């Protein structure tokens, strides 16, 4: 099995009228047991400032610091749980280094650092995650539900969330609308 950890899943155009329509998912984990990822292009409708207030973590907001970044829906599973995908920064209770350029933290202390000098340079805050059981993702890939590309720091952090699906599809080097959603064997 080839792991797709640190890859982006790009929803095929045929995946319409579903939760994952035009979604881009960063795969944090992918092994023989299944896969776990975070959708990186679907805003929930609140920004990080509002989330911190709701969690009562924002006691004295810094008016100079803009935490207007949108909180994103990470996926349909466990939507009350937060995940912060970010550039390397240590000293938090529950962080996992995914690559040399990307970490995942699930502890509240990373949220309290946002807007301070201790915050990571780049971050994405999501609620919930997308999960696949053993062989489920492989089946969906075989059914042409998803395409995958290696993740880049630029696609994760530099491209606006509304443009990530389009930018990811353009990075494929061909017109995704020309692909068939039918799978088959020759």
UniProtKB/Swiss-Prot annotation:
Alphabetized InterPro entries for the sequence: AlgH-like
Pfam family of the protein (one): DUF179
Gene Ontology cellular-component annotations: cytosol
Listed Gene3D superfamilies: VC0467-like
Record NCBIfam families: PRK00228.1-1 (NF001266)
PANTHER family, per database record: UNCHARACTERIZED PROTEIN YQGE, UPF0301 PROTEIN YQGE
Family label: Belongs to the UPF0301 (AlgH) family.
Protein name in the entry: UPF0301 protein Swoo_1337
Organism phylogeny: Bacteria, Pseudomonadati, Pseudomonadota, Gammaproteobacteria, Alteromonadales
